[in-house]
């Protein structure tokens, strides 16, 4: 969880340039994403608020989004209350991943009104809520009723309540020496105790504190804690890191000892997030859509394999054409011995010297029986050529779908669309 409370603090600091900016437009390009276009210093800034379970965040994005022709109801509510308004304040609640944006706007008759956007970044429980000046909920993206949530209600008309407090401490209000009071060196991992004690900490930052000293003692822990917390107050250094051993990707706003092999520095936190979440979003979209594609590919592969089996069986049967031709020839050669009504004739196969018994249609004349076998020969000969062509095409289809099945881990959304087409 790289977008922790400390990262949120840095992001809020970087967004202060938007204060006094005018809300020009509001869009909802994706189900869980709102884009607020803020006009400031004669330039438009896209403020992204996402409550995606895996990608929830707040940032300015330079990515271009396609907006639906008919905006969702949630976007319409935001437009009604916020468009044309001015941002008065952007603040973080404590050191948590909760952000509040105060907006001064005007209602339909021109009277001044005050609204607050509340973004709660909590993974799958993330929410986006709009409240009035009395903290009454106007609308929430995720409605929580007393029947579905025992802690609070998020419904229009109800007073806003914050998520249940975990009673954690703000790490910026606690020194390293004071932090010792909450750590038991005999009660398990120090990093986990730090995580459970301090608001806004993530495993990334608690592991960093522990890694700053070879051993954690009553002397080294306060030193490492103060050292890391002091560095979080410096100007941000937006870094992207990929661990080549595990393949895991991370980002943060400062240099970490854990980032040691492949590191890329970006010009801003927003550029960093665009790169990180765009790549992750692509993989997530691929994963979601690939589930259907996997089933489709497997079904097609099975279908083609079954088809090939039937074609091969039919092809083997078509090889019997030479027998049909032989029967026609032998009936013609022995036609003087055959009369209508005979059910079979035994004749000498002049190719092998063996006798052959040939079935006859007793209702037909000897010449009609001979023509029947000649027609069978010609039909099977033509069919054999058709089957040979179909078998080759089917084998190519099997190779095609087999290759797709092997490459699904590296496929893109565009590739999926191409395959579906």
Where are these regions (language model features)?
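Extended, highly charged segments
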Residues: 1-421
């Amino acid at each position: 969880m790289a977008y922790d409370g400390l990262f949120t603090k840095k992001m809020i600091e970087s967004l202060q340039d938007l204060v006094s900016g005018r809300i020009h437009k509001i869009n909802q390009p994706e189900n869980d994403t709102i884009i607020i276009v803020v006009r400031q210093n004669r330039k438009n800034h896209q403020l992204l608020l996402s409550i995606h379970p895996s990608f929830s965040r707040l940032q300015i994005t330079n990515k271009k989004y396609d907006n639906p022709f008919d905006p969702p109801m949630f976007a319409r509510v935001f437009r009604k209350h916020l468009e044309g308004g001015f941002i008065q304040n952007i603040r973080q609640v404590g050191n948590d991943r909760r952000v509040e944006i105060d907006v001064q706007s005007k209602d339909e008759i021109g009277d001044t009104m005050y609204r607050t956007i509340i973004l709660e970044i909590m993974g799958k429980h993330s929410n986006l809520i709009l409240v009035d000046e009395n903290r009454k909920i106007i609308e929430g993206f995720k409605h929580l009723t007393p029947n579905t949530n025992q802690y609070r209600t998020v419904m229009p008309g109800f007073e806003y309540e914050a998520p249940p407090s975990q009673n954690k401490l703000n790490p910026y209000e606690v020194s390293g020496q004071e932090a010792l009071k909450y750590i038991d060196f005999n009660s398990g991992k120090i990093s986990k105790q730090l995580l459970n004690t301090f608001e806004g900490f993530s495993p990334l930052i608690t592991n960093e504190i522990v890694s700053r000293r070879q051993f954690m003692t009553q002397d080294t822990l306060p030193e490492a804690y103060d050292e890391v917390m002091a560095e979080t107050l410096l100007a941000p250094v937006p870094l992207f890191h990929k661990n080549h051993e595990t393949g895991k990707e991370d980002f943060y706003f400062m240099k970490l000892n854990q980032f040691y092999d492949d590191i890329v520095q970006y010009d801003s936190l927003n550029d960093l997030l665009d790169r990180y979440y765009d790549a992750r979003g692509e993989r997530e979209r691929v994963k979601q859509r690939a589930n259907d594609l996997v089933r489709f590919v497997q079904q097609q592969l099975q279908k083609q394999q079954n088809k090939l089996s039937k074609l091969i069986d039919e092809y083997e049967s078509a090889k019997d054409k030479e027998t049909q031709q032989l029967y026609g020839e032998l009936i013609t050669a022995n036609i003087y011995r055959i009369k209508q009504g005979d059910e079979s004739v035994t004749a000498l196969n002049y190719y092998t010297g063996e006798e052959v018994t040939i079935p006859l249609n007793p209702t037909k004349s000897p010449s009609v029986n001979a023509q029947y076998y000649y027609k069978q020969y010609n039909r099977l000969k033509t069919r054999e050529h058709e089957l040979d062509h179909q078998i080759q095409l089917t084998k190519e289809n099997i190779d095609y779908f087999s290759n797709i099945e092997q490459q699904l881990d590296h496929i893109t959304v565009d590739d999926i669309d191409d395959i579906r087409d």
